[in-house]
Amino acid sequence: MDTEYEQVNKPWNELYKETMLGNKLMVNVGMEDQEVPLLPSNFLTKVRVGLSGGYITMRRFRIKIIPLVSRKAGVSGKLYLRDISDTKGQKLHCTESLDLGREIRLTMQHLDFSVSTRSGVPIVFGFEELVSPFLEGRELFSISVKWQFGLSKNCYSLPQSKWKVMYLEDALKVLKLSKKKASKTDSSV
């Protein structure tokens, strides 16, 4: 699983961290235990001086899943976030079963906790209950993940937020219908 990380140079309170998993991401049936960290372990060591004594707050998650197989293939699965800071490996969030043959955009306002800068960001994501008619080794989809984080002096918790799931073709249909309605009302006026 190839992972590329890109840092945008901005002040800490506006720092965006982008993780891009390109077409080389392999998601195979029977290999659901592959997990990807939201932040590389070496990132915090590079900026340790500017981070001493604070907490990282994570918000505005945006995940885009682009299928590399036909919609008719019947590929599906659930995306989850997991905390690996202890042996329990608590699952933080999990989606309903997604149709992975369609382009999907998932968003979440925030994670409901902050993480100490001394410990890194022990959050990983992966897939479970994958269903696919393809043999192992077939590339099923690519994923891009964007999230915003900043620094906080205090540890805090927020109410748990939920994933918002939007299938791109459904959103386009709604947009076309709203444009048609708008043009009809404009012509009748």
From Swiss-Prot:
This is Movement protein. Phosphorylated. GO terms for biological process: transport of virus in host, cell to cell. Belongs to the tombusvirus/aureusvirus movement protein p22 family. InterPro entries: TBSV_p22. It is found in: Host membrane. Transports viral genome to neighboring plant cells directly through plasmosdesmata, without any budding. The movement protein allows efficient cell to cell propagation, by bypassing the host cell wall barrier. GO terms for cellular component: host cell membrane; membrane; viral capsid. Keywords: Host membrane, Host-virus interaction, Membrane, Phosphoprotein, RNA-binding, Transport, Viral movement protein. Its main location: host cell. The lineage of its organism: Viruses, Riboviria, Orthornavirae, Kitrinoviricota, Tolucaviricetes. One of its GO terms (molecular function) is RNA binding. The keyword Magnesium does not apply. Interacts with host protein HFI22. Signal peptide: none annotated.
